[in-house]
């Protein structure tokens, strides 16, 4: 049986993203040379929300892009197991990242493997001056030496728990961060 516990509701997510937006601005001393890149899928929507808040706070339209890490993963998934053709969705970074302070955005930080793949993919696009990481939820259990620079909420979990982020933009359900516990 699976038990679900809501650890962040819509209001908590909004507050966390507002705080993270201020932290990004403060740490980067404004928005000069700043860019946001969301990791598909939910990272894209979170990057857009951070973009909107930074625009409201600073009045500056920071460039936003998204990155597909499919070909960079060490657990490559395939759209067809027979042909072993990877399910690639495409990267959309409509600006030059060279010399930019890029904030990679994702929903949950777990082992660090997704972030490693995203950094590899980003470096194939260009050479940013800095790469920072913003996540809505950090659940621990790292397998690689990667940490988030901006965290919405630290959510300690056990090995049999899973953290799920639901966003209205993609899931057609109310915004929430949920821990699914196997009992």
UniProtKB/Swiss-Prot annotation:
Reaction(s) the record says it catalyses: UMP + diphosphate = 5-phospho-alpha-D-ribose 1-diphosphate + uracil
Keywords (A to Z) from UniProt: Glycosyltransferase, RNA-binding, Transcription, Transcription regulation, Transcription termination, Transferase
Enzyme nomenclature, EC number: 2.4.2.9
Annotated motif PRPP-binding, positions: 102-114
InterPro entries, per database record: PRibTrfase_dom, PRTase-like, PyrR, PyrR_bifunctional
Biological processes, Gene Ontology terms: DNA-templated transcription termination
Highest taxon of source: Bacteria
One example GO MF annotation: uracil phosphoribosyltransferase activity
Pfam families for the chain: Pribosyltran
Residues at which substrate binds: 41-42, 106-114, 139, 163
SUPFAM superfamilies registered for this protein in UniProt: PRTase-like (SSF53271)
Protein's job: Regulates transcriptional attenuation of the pyrimidine nucleotide (pyr) operon by binding in a uridine-dependent manner to specific sites on pyr mRNA. This disrupts an antiterminator hairpin in the RNA and favors formation of a downstream transcription terminator, leading to a reduced expression of downstream genes.
Alphabetical list of NCBIfam families matching this protein: PRK05205.1-1, PRK05205.1-4, PRK05205.1-5
Quaternary state and interactors: Homodimer and homohexamer; in equilibrium.
Similarity-based family: Belongs to the purine/pyrimidine phosphoribosyltransferase family. PyrR subfamily.
Designated name of the protein: Bifunctional protein PyrR
Source organism (scientific name): Listeria monocytogenes serovar 1/2a (strain ATCC BAA-679 / EGD-e)
Native organism taxonomy: Bacteria, Bacillati, Bacillota, Bacilli, Bacillales
Gene of this entry: pyrR
